[in-house]
């Protein structure tokens, strides 16, 4: 969906929907859905296609998963291209779901929490999780749409109604909200500081980090924290972009990064 690249004839792309998302089944399922199993799924894809080493590309939660995958399987990773860094630490999660985004978009936040009684608002994540995993289907869908719409509204630098409305579609909203809340309430099934404490495992891997200056979903401090501990990685902060991968400046730098990687690290037949 993004602009064609001169490197498109160099790469064989393997795209997948993680457990419970997109076209994966069962839809929005939480059983056996954790980070360890996602890493195992990625490895199964790699071995199924007889890939020895590959360039791993991921954004937002995909950047989290890419980093953890690379730290567990560094010998199979040629390089990393990461967008919208999400380190998934407790304060990173709290920024969006408790006490950060509410200060930037108070009107969107009021819409978001309107379905939660005042006496439960001291822990918004738990309140939503309880509804998203409860048996009341009406409450579940209302929570899913509210959860997903907030992210859709906050993901672009400029308001984009069409972009945000996609997040409210039932199929998308239910999977996004249920699975995100499941991971976040469990701190993404990661140990405290796991990503930062294991940078030495991937320090040698060529890496480009692309992050929007005005990213309100995963604020740019997360990319800066990562790059400060990993000076070998290249950090590109995009001056006129938010979180979404569809932001023009983000698209440009991601395509440039894939082209540059192909030129520098891949041999053409």
Regions picked out by a protein language model, each given a short descriptive name:
Residues 216-222:
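Conserved alpha/beta-hydrolase "acid-adjacent" motif
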Residues 52-91:
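Conserved hydrolase catalytic core segment
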Residues 36-54:
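Conserved acidic catalytic loop of the alpha/beta-hydrolase fold
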Residues 233-269:
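Catalytic active-site module of serine/aspartate enzymes centered on a nucleophile-bearing elbow/loop
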Residues 16-33, 91:
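Glycine-rich "HGGG/HGxG" loop immediately N-terminal to the catalytic nucleophile
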Residues 202-203, 209-211:
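Short beta-strand/loop motif that positions the catalytic acidic residue
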Residues 75-128:
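A catalytic-pocket lid/entrance helix-loop region that shapes and gates access to the active site
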């Amino acid at each position: 969906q993004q602009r064609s690249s001169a490197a498109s004839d160099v790469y064989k792309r393997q795209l997948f929907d993680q457990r419970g998302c997109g076209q994966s089944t069962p839809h929005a399922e939480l059983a056996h859905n954790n980070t360890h199993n996602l890493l195992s799924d990625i490895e199964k894809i790699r071995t199924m296609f007889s890939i020895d080493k590959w360039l791993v590309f991921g954004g937002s939660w995909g950047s989290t998963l890419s980093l953890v995958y690379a730290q567990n399987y560094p010998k199979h990773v040629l390089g990393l291209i990461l967008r919208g860094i999400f380190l998934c630490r407790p304060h990173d999660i709290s920024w969006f779901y408790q006490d950060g985004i509410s200060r930037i978009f108070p009107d969107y936040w009021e819409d978001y929490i309107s379905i939660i009684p005042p006496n439960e608002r001291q822990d918004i994540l738990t309140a939503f999780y309880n509804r998203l995993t409860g048996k009341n289907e009406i409450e579940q869908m209302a929570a899913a749409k509210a959860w997903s719409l907030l992210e859709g509204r906050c993901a672009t630098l400029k308001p984009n109604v069409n972009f945000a409305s996609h997040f409210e579609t039932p199929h998308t909203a239910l999977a996004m909200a249920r699975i995100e809340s499941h991971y976040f309430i469990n701190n993404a099934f990661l140990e405290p500081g796991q990503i930062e404490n294991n940078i030495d495992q991937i320090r040698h891997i060529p890496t480009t980090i692309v992050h929007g200056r005005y990213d309100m979903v995963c604020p740019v401090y997360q990319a800066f924290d990562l790059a400060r501990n990993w000076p070998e990685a290249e950090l590109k902060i995009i001056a006129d972009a938010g979180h979404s991968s569809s932001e023009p400046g983000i698209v440009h730098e991601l395509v440039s990064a894939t082209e540059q990687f192909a030129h520098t690290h891949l041999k053409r037949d």
